[in-house]
């Protein structure tokens, strides 16, 4: 794979870990462009919106942890397939996270699609 795409995947994985697992906005903001645009309807735009989201996690889901199962990169986009747990011992959620990097290689835009992991499934394939 192209070295630039691998760098993009690593960069976004580090950013994601700082947000969700470490809940460290001060370090995460260095990965963000100033125009950071959020498409999750529950989170505000700009770096300040992400800071508020991290504070929400610290207060309401301090044990939240996510594992990146796989990642993909194409051009300025990085996609993560994630197993997210708000609390230990739960089934959690399957999440697709999409990030777009700006001309300086910083995270500039974010989308996500979130699906609860059900207790039972119509097939044996699992979500990951």
Predicted features by range, described:
Residues 1-128:
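C-terminal and inter-domain tail/linker signature
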């Amino acid at each position: 794979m192209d070295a630039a795409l691998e760098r993009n995947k690593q960069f976004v994985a580090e950013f994601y870990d700082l947000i969700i697992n470490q809940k460290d906005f001060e370090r995460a903001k260095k990965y963000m462009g100033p125009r950071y645009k959020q498409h999750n309807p529950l989170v505000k735009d700009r770096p300040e919106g992400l800071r508020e989201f991290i504070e929400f996690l610290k207060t309401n889901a301090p044990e939240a942890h996510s594992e990146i199962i796989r990642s993909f990169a194409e051009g300025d986009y990085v996609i993560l397939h994630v197993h997210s747990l708000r609390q230990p011992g739960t089934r959690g959620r399957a999440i697709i996270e999409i990030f777009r990097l700006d001309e300086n290689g910083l995270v500039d835009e974010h989308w996500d699609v979130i699906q609860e992991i059900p207790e039972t499934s119509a097939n044996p394939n699992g979500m990951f």
